[in-house]
């Protein structure tokens, strides 16, 4: 059984660990950037909205990237333009409101102002814990962020962490060096 599972996993890796996969997946958004902060922010937002139909996710991601971020996620967060969405309860994407987006941006703003990048912020948020536990401790108060008791929400955040931490893939970035892939 173990060998059969290993072979199946290797076949899946061969299918999805290719550059062609990027075009039709939410990971395309952070792949548009080269700056660490832009990759982190774009990746976190892309994983946050990764609920539902892939085409709808990509359409919404494009809207965020082009209309809100103006292709500069880090600059957008530091500009504080997102503050205008405080208390706005209308729909941002599916079951997320504009106020949810505001809270996410506010948390990202604090992370970048205090530590310069999200990786460092997570390292300082708790003295110990897995990357997922650290991510949850910082972003868990936001609608749609990981509740460690919810496998579906944790799955999205594990996807984001894999993108940032895993180093042996053309799909993933491996830009976070303070965490080891074994911790995923």
Residue ranges of model-derived segments:
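HhH-family (HhH-GPD) DNA N-glycosylase catalytic core used in base-excision repair
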Residues: 1-184
